[in-house]
């Protein structure tokens, strides 16, 4: 979203001086329009970020100090503009080609670390910030046999699993083989993870929702996380445990049906899913008496998290909203039954 500029050392590299027109292909949004800096060309954005990242890694070649590179790439987000050499690499269009470009970026980073003899001493974490966006030509991709949300319901912005389940891949030479860990974790857990890894003592108001994954990564134990709060694009919340997911709203809270108030009103005000038995969230079991106690406990937990200003153990942290915004009323107000 405009203005499209590069920011380097806390300053924009050029002042916006022209307008870029929006781009679409087969009804898929490739790029929003808007103001752009003089040195900004959309198709060069991702390659520029890759180049700067590789340069930074090379600059650390002879350093004796640990280095950290946070690389929030623009792909496969809009603007969906794969470089010329990647166009046509897949059969599902620009989005698929852009994903292949990400694969090549990973290849370049690993190759550079290996060349600099740093690979064996580097932890690489690959993740996404959310599920696939439903407005980038998903229906066309599905017709071609590619389902970006896999078996999961919904897309980016939705409260459903398709909006929140992401790849989280950790590579650490000599520590892991080809293995999978099904622990309940979140990207916010990296704050506490890095703190524990570096022996940093967290202050009261630091990482109030973050549980360390270091016991998992170091193979010395498990995360203390028992549940996880999700938030939809419209601010509606859900609470997820290892088996159940309670949604404190009757709709998606994002772009997928049901969205319009008239449609949401057709459904119960809350949704409950057994994520283990029903990972696709097809059956809302909120009225099932067998889960009545679990629902009550999950509502109490959410209320406590809001009142405490945190979902981790520790001193209370004040919210500036008086705990009364619309999306939390359903569990902040005492109600009988479900």
Predicted feature descriptions by range:
Residues 134-138, 144-159, 175-183, 188-271, ...:
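C-terminal cap/loop subdomain of S1 sulfatases and analogous C-terminal strand-loop tails that border
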Residues 2-4, 8-11, 51-98, 133-134, ...:
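Active-site His/acidic residue clusters
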Residues 28-42:
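Short glycine/proline- and acidic residue-enriched helix-loop micro-motifs
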């Amino acid at each position: 979203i405009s203005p499209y500029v590069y920011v380097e050392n806390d300053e924009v590299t050029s002042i916006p001086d022209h307008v870029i027109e929006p781009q679409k292909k087969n009804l898929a949004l490739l790029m929003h329009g808007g103001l752009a800096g003089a040195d900004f060309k959309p198709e060069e954005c991702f390659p520029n970020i890759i180049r700067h990242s590789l340069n930074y890694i090379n600059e650390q070649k002879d350093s004796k100090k640990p280095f950290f590179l946070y690389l929030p790439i623009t792909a496969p987000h809009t603007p969906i503009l794969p470089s010329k050499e990647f166009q046509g690499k897949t059969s599902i269009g620009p989005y698929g080609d852009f994903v292949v470009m990400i694969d090549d970026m990973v290849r370049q980073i690993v190759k550079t670390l290996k060349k600099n003899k740093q690979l064996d001493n580097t932890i690489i974490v690959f993740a996404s910030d959310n599920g696939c966006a439903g407005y980038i030509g998903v229906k066309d991709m599905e017709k071609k046999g590619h389902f970006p949300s896999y078996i999961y319901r919904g897309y980016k912005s939705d409260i459903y699993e398709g909006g929140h389940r992401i790849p989280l891949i950790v590579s650490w030479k000599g520590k892991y083989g080809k293995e999978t860990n099904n622990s309940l974790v979140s990207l916010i857990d990296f704050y506490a993870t890095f703190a524990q890894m570096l022996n940093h003592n967290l202050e009261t108001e630091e990482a109030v929702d973050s549980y360390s994954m270091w016991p998992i990564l170091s193979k010395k134990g498990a995360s203390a996380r028992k549940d996880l709060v999700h938030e939809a694009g419209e601010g509606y919340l859900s609470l997820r445990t290892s088996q159940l997911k309670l949604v404190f709203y009757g709709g998606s809270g994002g772009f997928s049906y049901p969205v319009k108030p008239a449609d949401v009103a057709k459904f119960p005000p809350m949704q409950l899913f057994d994520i283990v038995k029903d990972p696709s969230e097809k059956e809302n079991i909120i009225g099932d008496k067998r889960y009545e106690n679990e629902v009550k406990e999950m509502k109490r937990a959410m209320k406590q998290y809001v009142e405490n200003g945190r979902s981790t153990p520790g001193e209370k942290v004040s919210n500036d909203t008086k705990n009364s915004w619309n999306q939390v009323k359903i569990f902040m107000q005492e109600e009988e039954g479900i």
